[in-house]
Amino acid sequence: YTFTDMDQFIRRSTVPEPLDLFFGLMAILLLLEISRRIVGNTFTAVVLGFLLYMYFGNYFPDVISHKSYDLGRIVGHMYMTLEGIFGVPLSVSVSFVMLFVVYGTFMDVAGAGGFWLDLSLATMGRQSASAGRGAVITSALLGGPQGSGVATTMSVTPIMWPILKKAGYSPNMAAGLIATGGIGAVLSPPLMGAAAFLIMQFMGVSFWDVIVMVTVPTILYYVGTLFMVELEARKYRFAPPETEAKTVRQVMLSQGYHLLSIAVLVAILVVWNKSPEYAALGAIGTTVLTSFLSKDRNEWLTPRKIITAMIEGAKNMLPVAVLLAAAGLIVGTFTLTGLGLKISSIIMYASGGSVLAAILLAMIASMLIGLSLPITATYIMTVVMVAPALVKLGIPMHVAHLLAFYFAVLSEVSPPVGLSPCAAAAVTGGNPFGSMMQAWKYSLPAFLVPFFFSTTTVGYSLLILGGNWLDFILATMTSLCSLLFVALGIIGYLRKKLPMVERVLLIIAAFVMVISPIGWSIPGLAPLFAGILMILHHLRVTRGPARKSEASV
């Protein structure tokens, strides 16, 4: 019905005919029911709430009220234009996300998951921090091609939990650590989840630009987690892993061909400057061809395996497609009612024109939205509400979008709702809420990362698209030191237990470095040097082996 007479169909959107109204209502109601079954009750209730807001807009407080729209206008806007169901989110789903999800499935069927696992185990080493380090590296390597926090967590937990358990990690600690690494998969190139493609579409930039922008923040996310792992291993004296892992050379010689498809994807995007669709198709074709280099015939992508991969890819895509179609109803509400501009005005007023205050409000809003919505929906709502205010305050558009994306990812790890920690706890036997708190603990340094690249012009250079190399080096050095200071303050251990005064001072130094202008100035460098001097002093006055402790929940 929709495509029988498309031109006239769109023209009737402001005054739908009875048949338009019937099919439009059916489409919206069916979408809500499918969303309830696949995505969940909470998300569907939020979408329904926005639809009710359109109908009863004049009953809301003055700051967000609007003239109410009748049923015909709502259905016409949501069903008969490119602003609602068939808007940008669903367009991105069909054009880009589908192909990359299928690409990830092809890699999985071809045995790439085993390659990433073997490679991470080969890099673990045999130190006390090796088990935790291996869990984080495995999540980072496996998560990049998967692009899903929960999927990565569920893939890594059964393999890494026995290793972490032998090292001395409690069930809650292990679940929290693996979940923290898994959630970082949504930030990790090349897939990064559906939100990355929405950034590309909303901003009108290339997919390669998005990959470049997220690279350094993603590295900082994992570096902050690794700082926590290394210091915690010192504190609790975890045992080194007992697994007989292959060497990196052995892994690369036997399975390194899995990297070829990623190389082809990057080459098509960068060298030939083609669209993400071409890149995904080229990567899928390369995966099929290189699968025959495997010594295990079960990993060969024969016609039967290709069909299996396509079926599994379609199944994996279903929740994403439904979520993005339903998210179109939320976006349509903002475009019709002007709600985004109203909320932006509220943020401008509440922040008093302060960039830092506006970013804090954006973080709080994202955390609250993330309590009930998945990452992609959280990003969409955060960006339409917050980005206009941030841009008015002078933050570049690409920085505002990446802020919304990063905060949406962090909302997934924040209590009291966290799917990845709960999923990991089901395997380790830990307490779900305790696992969430552990995941939150491991990710605390990462909460500083958005402030690094958004509060100053020097910090913008971390996204590589702006600034110069001197700014980039200075911002990177400052960011790494801040992450280390926060990790030391939280864990409270270096060679021995840190005094509470030093822990507090290190955390204060890290925050001062965030809120003060980064640069060759006293406000920017004083807390940096103060923190470094405290660490050097502690290293000089402490001698002897660290005290053995028991890992606690």
Regions inferred by a protein language model and the residue ranges of each:
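Transmembrane alpha-helix boundary signature
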Residues: 1-13, 38, 58-68
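Membrane-interfacial loop-to-helix junctions in multi-pass transporters
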Residues: 18-22, 82-96, 122-135, 167-173, ...
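Hydrophobic mid-bilayer segments of alpha-helices in multi-pass membrane transport proteins
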Residues: 21-30, 41-73, 94-102, 257-265, ...
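Core transmembrane alpha-helical segments of multi-pass membrane transporters/permeases
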Residues: 33, 38, 48-63, 71, ...
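Transmembrane alpha-helix interface/packing and boundary motifs in multi-pass membrane proteins
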Residues: 36, 104-108, 139-148, 180-186, ...
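Hydrophobic transmembrane alpha-helices that form the pore/transport pathway of multi-pass ion
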Residues: 117-185, 204, 375-408, 417-434
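Long, contiguous bundles of hydrophobic transmembrane helices that form the permeation core
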Residues: 212-316, 419-511, 543, 547-553
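Long hydrophobic segments that form regular secondary structure
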Residues: 256-399, 406-407, 487, 496, ...
